[in-house]
């Protein structure tokens, strides 16, 4: 439940930044989907359902958004190329319109952000970097929950420490 609450906090933070005018890029949006799944898995834990599959899906969700955050950080830092759909890499963009550069974006050009652009940093880390780190911590929480669940299944004793 703590890991799901952490995903909810990260997702809420992303929406707050967006409300404050920090428009997300496509890769930022991609990183939100696994958080939504993790939140859903946390909600399912409230019901008497098989716990292990829920914990595994929660862990995979946190790991996937962390991996996306690492990839996005690499794109922002120029360590590797990002998707051409949101970085414009490999194209002569000098003669292209906004709708040609980002066809899936809204017509409001002031809200368009390239995935290779860092729009906010704290302690030299971008939002994507923070998502990668914090989601990695959440993945560890999910994995600890899996280990504890398995320990109870195997030994019949809950670890209350």
Regions found by a protein language model. Give the residues of each.
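Extracytosolic (periplasmic/ER-lumenal) interhelical loops and adjacent juxtamembrane/interface segments
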Residues: 77-126
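Immediate flanking context of iron-sulfur cluster ligation sites
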Residues: 4-23, 42-45, 76, 106-107
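Transmembrane alpha-helical segments in integral membrane proteins
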Residues: 125-153
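Loop-to-helix transition at the N-terminal end of transmembrane alpha-helices
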Residues: 22-37
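C-terminal TM-helix exit segments that contain a strictly Trp-centered aromatic cap at the helix terminus
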Residues: 12-18, 64-79, 98
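Membrane-interfacial alpha-helical segments at the cytosolic side of multi-pass membrane proteins
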Residues: 36-48, 136-146
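Short, Lys/Arg-enriched, Gly/Pro-containing loop segments at transmembrane-helix junctions
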Residues: 151-161
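Interfacial segments of alpha-helical transmembrane regions
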Residues: 1-5, 47-66, 140
């Amino acid at each position: 439940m703590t890991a799901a609450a952490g995903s909810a906090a990260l997702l809420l933070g992303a929406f707050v930044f967006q409300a404050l005018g920090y428009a997300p890029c496509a890769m930022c949006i991609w990183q939100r989907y696994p958080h939504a799944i993790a939140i859903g898995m946390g909600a399912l834990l409230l019901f008497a359902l098989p716990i292990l599959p829920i914990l595994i899906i929660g862990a995979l969700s946190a790991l996937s958004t962390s991996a996306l955050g690492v990839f996005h950080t690499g794109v922002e830092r120029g360590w590797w190329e990002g998707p051409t759909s949101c970085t414009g890499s490999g194209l002569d963009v000098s003669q292209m319109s906004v709708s040609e550069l980002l066809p899936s974006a809204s017509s409001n050009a002031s809200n368009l952000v390239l995935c290779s652009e860092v729009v906010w940093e704290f302690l030299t880390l971008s939002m994507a970097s923070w998502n990668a780190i914090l989601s990695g911590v959440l993945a560890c929480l999910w994995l600890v929950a899996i280990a504890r669940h398995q320990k109870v299944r195997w030994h019949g004793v809950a670890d209350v420490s």
